[in-house]
């Protein structure tokens, strides 16, 4: 069976987009040209690959059988080209990553720096987004994959967990709660809380975990970004409950983070990707690098957070 690789790619893109018009745009060819390419492929195979309607196209039984094989063939071909170019370090291309802000702050610069050392000609584009937009970016193929929370789920998405992090209290060092080693959530009642908007993944997680409590937190100030809440905390306007990763690396002169308990609320961060996505060789390598770096460094994550808290408490005492 002799098929041009371009025809195989056209078949895969048409199958994923379910539209000749959309597929033609993605391939940067005219719709008639795409139609001819698919028709020629069907004639060579002596089988119909698509059922065509006025609104969209769907795969036939033969098309469904061919699709995973076609994806694998394209992936292998791209990897072969990538590996050949690897010998001369002439990589080109771009990896697009959707990412929630706190993950960006903690380790992404390290990962990008390492990736750039290995593949200096591959660009990395970061789409810093909230949990829902991060998921949508991956679903619509705007990004190759993303780093997100696991409480935002979709049946079309695979989630690879990276870290399970607890929430901490962020308050000024002169706050009444600042000298405590641990703070119970109920102890926050009566204080003005600074939180991200109620539709955010972090806020939803907190409210779900505390929904059965007879008391309620006073979300007095609402912001868009966790970093903004830290600024308001530093100004003495209130206190905040943040994921551990959101606490600054370099200790603020006036802010401390204290573990929150009763209950301990955690969020799980990980890599999200479409189940049917075929990552480019460059994206596959960045994906693997992120997992390896996080696995190697995760033992230091909470050590660093605890050390920052311990030193801050010593300074207060």
From Swiss-Prot:
Record organism: Escherichia coli (strain K12)
Instruction: Show the InterPro entries listed in the entry.
Output: HTH-type_LysR_regulators, LysR_subst-bd, Tscrpt_reg_HTH_LysR, WH-like_DNA-bd_sf, WH_DNA-bd_sf
Does the keyword section mention Disulfide bond?
A: no
What is an example of a Pfam family matching this protein? HTH_1
> CDD domains of this UniProt entry?
PBP2_LTTR_like_4
Q: Which Gene3D superfamilies match?
A: 3.40.190.290, Winged helix-like DNA-binding domain superfamily/Winged helix DNA-binding domain (1.10.10.10)
Instruction: List GO BP terms, alphabetically.
Output: regulation of DNA-templated transcription
Q: What keywords would UniProt list here?
A: DNA-binding, Transcription, Transcription regulation
The UniProt GO MF terms for this protein read: DNA-binding transcription factor activity; sequence-specific DNA binding
Output the PANTHER family linked to this UniProt entry.
HTH-TYPE TRANSCRIPTIONAL REGULATOR YBHD, LYSR FAMILY TRANSCRIPTIONAL REGULATOR
Q: Which residues bind DNA?
A: 20-40
A Gene Ontology CC term for this entry? cytosol
Lineage of this protein's species? Answer: Bacteria, Pseudomonadati, Pseudomonadota, Gammaproteobacteria, Enterobacterales
Q: Which gene encodes it?
A: ybhD
* SUPFAM superfamilies named among the record's database cross-references: Periplasmic binding protein-like II, Winged helix' DNA-binding domain
Q: Which residue ranges does the record assign to the HTH lysR-type domain?
A: 1-60
* Entry similarity comment: Belongs to the LysR transcriptional regulatory family.
Q: What is this protein called?
A: Uncharacterized HTH-type transcriptional regulator YbhD
């Amino acid at each position: 069976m002799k098929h041009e690789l371009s025809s195989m790619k056209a078949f895969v893109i048409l199958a994923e987009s379910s539209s000749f018009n959309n597929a033609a745009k993605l391939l940067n060819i005219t719709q008639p040209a795409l139609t001819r390419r698919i028709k020629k492929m069907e004639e060579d195979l002596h089988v119909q690959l698509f059922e065509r309607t006025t609104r969209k196209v769907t795969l036939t039984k033969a098309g469904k059988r061919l699709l995973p094989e076609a994806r694998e063939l394209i992936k292998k071909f791209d990897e072969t080209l990538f590996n050949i170019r690897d010998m001369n370090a002439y990589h080109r291309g771009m990896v697009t990553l959707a990412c929630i802000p706190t993950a960006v702050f903690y380790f992404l610069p390290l990962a990008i720096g390492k990736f750039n050392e290995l593949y200096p000609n591959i660009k990395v584009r970061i789409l810093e987004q909230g949990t829902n937009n991060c998921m949508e970016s991956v679903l619509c193929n705007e990004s190759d994959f993303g780093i997100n929370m696991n409480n935002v789920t979709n049946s079309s998405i695979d989630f690879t967990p990276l870290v399970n992090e607890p929430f901490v209290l962020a308050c000024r060092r002169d706050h009444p709660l600042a000298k405590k080693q641990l703070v119970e959530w109920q102890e926050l009642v009566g204080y003005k809380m600074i939180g991200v908007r109620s539709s955010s993944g972090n806020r939803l997680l907190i409210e779900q975990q505390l929904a059965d409590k007879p008391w309620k937190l006073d979300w007095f100030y609402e912001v868009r970004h966790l970093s903004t809440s830290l600024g308001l905390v530093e100004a003495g306007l209130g206190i905040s409950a943040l994921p551990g990763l959101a606490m600054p690396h370099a200790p603020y002169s006036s802010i401390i983070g204290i573990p929150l308990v009763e209950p301990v609320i955690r969020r799980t961060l990980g890599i999200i990707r479409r189940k049917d996505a075929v990552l480019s060789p460059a994206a596959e390598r960045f994906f693997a690098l992120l997992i390896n770096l996080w696995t190697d460094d995760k033992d230091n994550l909470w050590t660093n957070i605890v050390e920052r808290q311990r030193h801050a408490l010593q300074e207060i005492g």
